[in-house]
Amino acid sequence: MRYLDQALEAYGKSDVYPFHMPGHKRNPLPFPEVYGIDITEIDGFDNLHHAEGILKEAQQRAADLYGSAHCYYLVNGSTCGILASICAAVKKRGRILAARNSHKAVYHALFLSELTAEYLYPAVTECGIQGQITPRQVEDALKKDPEISAVVITSPTYEGVISDIEGIAKVAHVHGIPLIVDSAHGAHLGFGGEFPQNAVRLGADAVIESLHKTLPSFTQTAPVSYTHLRA
């Protein structure tokens, strides 16, 4: 019987190429010795729950990088960012427009805030995967139900399908409501000419990204970026 650390070490030394998260792909990137920098909330190192110093500065640099007004670091992956964004944007027992292929965290938020959802169904592509959500779908749904307080979609999806965020954001804003984008698989967007632009710069009001999915970051690390979001 092997111990967990032994199994992990053996896997790390194997010739298996990891087509899975996290995005660092087990590459030996330069990084300080882990135990030497593992601390708690001590003087000079701020508090993530109420950042005022070095963590606040780091989050502001991330906000500048992604093009948002505010950015908050998360340590429970994208899930808590999705929960926080939906709970902040929609009052309890309110109404929300959600893509039917949303992550289960969206449904968790609906349950927590006792929300009623109208659903957007993405078209199924010829490959058998769920495709885009279109601005026209959003427009039609919002005209039908003016009580909806926010729109939440996933872009890119697990399969890499990207919706027209700019068009959807414009529609949502015409109706005076925010667009929340679960971009957990899109933390790399906007970096390099071959990638599409990130959802923040395309007009979304709250964007949740998982750095550990597509970038060289540790598991569970994620930021949520806000431009204009209020309940």
Predicted regions and their residues:
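Short beta-strand-to-turn element immediately C-terminal to the catalytic PLP-Schiff-base lysine
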Residues: R201, A222-Y226
